[in-house]
Amino acid sequence: MKTSRLACFTLTAALLGAPALAADKVSFKDPTGDDNGPGTYKYPTDPVYKRGSFDLTDFSLAKKGDKLDVSLGFNTTLEDPWKTGSGFSVQMAFIFIDTDGKEGSGSTESLPGLNVKFAPEFAWDKVIVISPQGASRVKAEVGSKAGAVKDNVLVPDRVKGSGRKITATVNAPGLQGEPSQWRYQVLIQSNEGFPAGNDLMTRKVNEYEGQHRFGGGNDGECDPHVVDMLAGAGKGDASEVKAQHEALAFECGEEGVVKKQATLTMVGGEAAPAEKK
């Protein structure tokens, strides 16, 4: 009888543990103090933009069936001064994913308002938009502004900020492969309730900072509107600050015409730091 009960218990434990063991998760780190884009950007002057609000510290993604669980860490405690109900207000993030690693497969253009592109060998297949605004508003903006890539934009079912973390759950049926084989780029921006023109709810970077505008860039559209990002190997070491500044380097001509656009790569892939949960 004792042997039978022990065998039953062991089998039950194994069955309960099986799904967790099958989940595939990747994690990356980012150095602190690099929330200055190409090295020159400054925060808006309004006090709601606390120091560290756009300073990415870590990113993780886990695939569980048809869903993706995402976590983003920041270098300050999140607040919701604009009462969005999401637990945060000023942050916004774009998680670009290259699922097949094939040059020429996917898109090299980013989304409207970011003013960056991707190198051909890092063309993206899917992008997750993390916003404190409701999913219906985000989906409407994507539908009207993302053009030909709108079907490759994933909007989370759930987004929540708590402490220093923003977590989200994304429904992604049919997404092929495992997270440890994918490549990633996380771009940190600021949630804009009244975006200019075709911008996808992103905040402008100007030459001089203002109450609700970043400074240190250009008043045209030749500068990358990215405050922080993953760089290097995504381990969080000091060399990644320089790598970020180089990736976001840009040149503007007269009247804000693009002379050199910021061109990005990704982290992860075959060498991604994966962990089995």
Could you describe each region identified by the protein language model?
Residues 1-9:
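Bacterial N-terminal signal peptides that target proteins for export
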Residues 9-16:
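Hydrophobic helical h-region of N-terminal Sec-dependent signal peptides
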Residues 11, 53-57, 79-81, 152-153, ...:
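Short alpha-helical segments and helix-capping/turn motifs at coil-helix boundaries
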Residues 18-22:
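Sec/Tat signal peptide C-region and signal peptidase I cleavage site
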Residues 23-27, 99-115, 176-277:
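Acidic/polar low-complexity flexible segments
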Residues 24-39:
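Short N-terminal segments immediately surrounding and downstream of signal-peptide cleavage
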Residues 24-25, 44-132, 263-276:
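Surface-exposed, glycine/proline- and aromatic-rich loop segments on solvent-exposed faces
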Residues 128-183, 188-200:
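Short helix-loop boundary/capping segments
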